[in-house]
Swiss-Prot record:
The keyword Secreted is annotated on this UniProt entry: no
Active-site residues annotated for this sequence: E105 (proton acceptor)
Protein name: Glutathione-specific gamma-glutamylcyclotransferase
Subcellular location: Cytoplasm; Nucleus
Family annotation (Gene3D superfamilies): Gamma-glutamyl cyclotransferase-like
Its job: Gamma-glutamylcyclotransferase acting specifically on glutathione, but not on other gamma-glutamyl peptides. Allows utilization of gluthathione through subsequent cleavage of the Cys-Gly dipeptide by Cys-Gly metallodipeptidase dug1.
The reaction(s) this protein catalyses: glutathione = L-cysteinylglycine + 5-oxo-L-proline
Binding site for substrate: V12, F13, G14, Y15, G16, S17
Amino acid sequence: MKTLSPEGSLWVFGYGSLIWHPPPHYDYSIPCFIKGYVRRFWMRSEDHRGTVNSPGLVLTLIPYEEWKQFSDWSFTPFDEGCWGMAFRIPAKYATQVREYLDDREVNGYTAHSVPVYAHTGDEIPVLENCLVYVGTSKSPQFQPSDDLTQMAKIISTRRGKSGDNFVYLFELAKCLRHLSPESKDIHVFELEAEVRKQMQKTR
């Protein structure tokens, strides 16, 4: 939409920490979702939420058809779309913010352009081109798993330069509950519940 995208502006889609820690200089944001991807805690973090010796787990997006190759597909419901937040960066800051994000997402992520939608069932995107960073399955940091208990054990105990791994998960779950009446993510909410259960046992 032209009214939403002045010439030279940059739109960025956040599906993880960008939702509550948005890029600098944004002047507008939209709750929205992208189609054809699932969100999973399948990327090792050796910097922000863990260390080289004790990596944490952070998010990536997996194309739906690729996700079907992994074992958690057989018993995990597929929610249409991945909810997050799109942020508009004015043209005069676009290059600066792109460089900032390239550096922030350096650990195994690549940049892609995707359409985003405002409501479940929409056929026409609210934005045609939105920048998103995806940790692909070819990344050495990619670590698929269907073991929720083991994933929760990692997330509940790891810490990196950006803080505790479990805070990353809890902040995401909180944001998803408030983004939109339509926003949900079964994987995130089930993992959050398991982490809270494990942390309660250790207190």
